[in-house]
């Protein structure tokens, strides 16, 4: 029976505990929500700040806080300014009625000077500090004169000091008060903005002067709590800065508290240095720092008071929810939370951008399909529809007025249609005149045969023109469809690149972190996006030191771990001291190229019909191209140069090279009716594996020189611009380090005089070359060809030479101990 009761009571007790915990959580959230609404949405926070700033003063009699706060409130939260001024006056009354009267006088002067400033300028933000300055100076001068009846030099100086401080505090409050507004704070705060915010906090703490319990000052406790919180959030630099600023303001309020600047600064420094020990470490730093400075400042007399004040501040710090410290840390530069916030923001921007690019890609793809469908539908139209249209035009001018119309087209429709169709086809093929049987049959059948024959001949000319125009339009649609599809694919690839997410390589990340930390390098974070051979992509977050560890140490170590040359692709240094750098590592190119070119116009002129280009395509491809325009001179130069420019733009956009050449061909063939064309010789080298694609359109052969061997590369394609549609033949070759790729126009290849076999002559000259320098080879080949012509340049000449070599990195790989290296798993 007891067991049964325990079994029943156990679950019931658990359910009751869960209900109690749920009720407590709901209550906590409700209270937090109401407090947040009360302080920030309803503006009670400004009442609290105004009350404490009304109590705040420095140098025993200077009141520079109240009027700047009210002026800033008028600009930032005008709807809460009335409550703020009441709070300021109430706070001043708790000190003395004299303070309250001075602030009231300053407010009245402020309204007067504001009206004057409104007539001078419309920029209220720029005018506010000046208005506050004159208002505070006038109020102090009038108050002192009314009180004493005289105005001494000391009073002048104090009035100017008070007005100057009010001027500066107005600028500071304009920067710091917006942090308390309901609107979302920007992603990060500058160091200057943090200092302005701390001056505001310290000014508010000054208003707590005089509140004490058994010798423990309220402003001391809260000041240490603020310094401890910021040292834990932002580290030693932020903690020390906050300590100096807070201590300085408290010291100005009470000369006896001047040592607090040293105490708070040193405590903030120690707390920040010990932040790695979590809250306990930062708390120990505060206690040790405050005790040490207290021993030097006050001796053993106030040691226990200082200890109690620090312990209370530590208790408040330990009771502060971690969610609050994390939320504040998001706005402090250099913190991990700020870095994560930045990454999250960048990820959101990336997703939005990728979504937009995807939408554009889908639009272009839909347009491409629409054009392609229309183009295919046009191609699938049967010849019968064309024949029907043609015959309808013939009958309209002949059979409509014929007396045999009913017999031919009603009673014998099929026979009439077939006979006229046969006559049309025979006439189109130029065989009707010789086909006596068909001609006789048609003349016997049709009473207007002569008229119909003439109409068919005339209409055929118009019909052919119509078909030619229709073909042009169809080719244009096909070109647009292919281009839109190419653009869609490029944008889809770009979207995938934007949306690139890190792959799950937890084991490899741990191995890399352990290896680097064993070497003495601190790594904050590692993200591996890809370990694909030749496409490695790793990003790291490391402390910024400015000594180039990324390039000199980390990249060489990764090269040994991954068995592939790694280099720094991008590095973003932290603009703040003790911040973090974001470094991207990637595969380096396995090969590099060096180039040379020689170029000459016919007859030594300035304008050549040849054009050439050498360019990098992305990170791992290199392209060289030569175009030879038909003939010589300006027109040929225009054609070849236009071909090269179009090729560069299209290839750089990422569109496939075959589509690029087809597009250029369609553009050049459609844009004019002149019989012009240009050749194109294109080579694309993959710098990762040294493979090479040759796309030759009406061009001369290319040559690969490998040691003493010379290999010819050629393909048979018509020149660009002759026909509207053709298939590009692609020739692939595998290059090796040390190979020389030699491309040339027909002016070089066919230039040698009295040479029957140009291939053998060119190979013999290449084998005889004693240099491997690309520029020297280009110059020597051109010189040899010109020499065979007795120094005459009888055609445009262009030769391009590309040498491929292994890419040797700047820094050699650093061996990693085998205990940290599991290359099978890494790769």
From Swiss-Prot:
Its record classes its membrane topology as: Multi-pass membrane protein
The name this protein goes by in its record = Stage II sporulation protein E
Q: According to its record, what are the GO cellular component terms?
A: endospore-forming forespore; plasma membrane
User: What are the names of the required cofactors?
Assistant: Mn(2+)
Among PROSITE patterns, the record links this protein to: PPM_2 (PS51746)
Protein task: Normally needed for pro-sigma E processing during sporulation but can be bypassed in vegetative cells. Activates SpoIIAA by dephosphorylation.
The gene for this chain is spoIIE
Residues passing through the membrane, by range: 49-69, 71-91, 116-136, 142-162, 175-195, 206-226, 247-267, 269-289, 299-319, 320-340
Name the Enzyme Commission number(s) assigned to this protein. 3.1.3.16
The principal location of this protein is membrane
Q: What class of enzyme is it?
A: hydrolase
